[in-house]
Amino acid sequence: MSNTKIGIFDVTQKSNKQLTWVLAVLLVLEALVCVGDYIGLVGVSRGPLVYGISRITQSGVGKVLLPIVCSYFFIHTWFFFRRSLAAANSMLRYLVLAIIALIVCDMVLGLMPDSFSTLEQIQHPSKFTSFASSFKSVSLGLQTLLKTVLSIGLIVKFTGRIRTFAWVTLVCVLLIGDGRYLYTYLYNAGTGAFNQGLALGMMVFKYLTVVIPVIFLRRTMTYTNVKSADGDTDIN
């Protein structure tokens, strides 16, 4: 890697289009997941739209498959970013590879039969269910740590849109941690309409802290009509 800091990664025109539609689909799916969680939490009054969304998001299959499909699109975007880092000969690509590996593990656990939770499984979890729950908690912590280290590395080694993405990711990681504690405290302290409004605010907060980093990640890779890093077949 030269002394000149890279501010943006160049990808092929085909990859640029793929990244754009993947982002668009991901934004819609994440919105469905968040709205579904809100409906399930506060029991919003039924209507045609609410009923349709709840049918998709609150069924056993929907609760499992929607997050898995979202994870697939996250992996797709991270994969292109990792490949761009590899083309730039940056060791940070291994951090991205570790993040991808953890997401894949979460996906595999989500596809296991015990993931389709019933009331009986929730009240009397199997050994696998307990293991999966513990693993996902550990995975979340490791991903948070990896993203923090990755962000610091990107801030030091790169510039432009790549550095902006790193700062955005770092801020969102910190906000998510603090937001969970604040939400739990306020929810336990409040009642009735306050908690319903708090749940709505948390839904919006969760959606924004998930999708904003992905939007900025997408902006780090674009087609500039010159020889592309994405054209390199190296996938180390």
List each language-model region with its residue ranges.
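Alpha-helical transmembrane segments of multi-pass membrane proteins
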Residues: 26-44
